[in-house]
Amino acid sequence: VQLFIILFLSVLCLTPNGEKHYSKVYYADGNIACEGWVQDSKKVDFWIFYHANGQVKNKGHYALGYREKYWHHYTNNGSLESEGHYLKGKKNNWWSYYNSTGEVIHKCQLHNDVKNGYCLHFKGNEIVKASRYSEGKKQQEWTDYTVFTRENNLLNLR
């Protein structure tokens, strides 16, 4: 881990001002840890990070050193674990979370990494529980999808 950090910092420090270049960082065993674009010592554009076993860990875009836009996160066996939007390095908008077979188990609205809006829990394709959050605090919970959609004036959220 220490070697990884040293290599990563040295790669970022070698970036000439204003010039964009492609960077690769490796684990101590020689496996790739991450790769992507660097400009003005900050991550920009598309990046891929890898687990120590070589499987993709996460991938997405950076802007001015912050995670931006849509990202995918994977388990160390390559299964999709979660996906959603970042804004200035914080999770925002809808995020989806998956089980090991690739089924959605949870969707949640986030604002600056905090639950803010609706969170839906699934079993198969059915919503089994819904909650509404405000600034990370649960405000209400429903276990009946029909009642939930009616009380909140919502259409199909599946």
Model-derived regions, located:
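Glycine/tyrosine- and acidic-biased, solvent-exposed loop/turn segments at the edges of beta-strands
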Residues: F4-R158
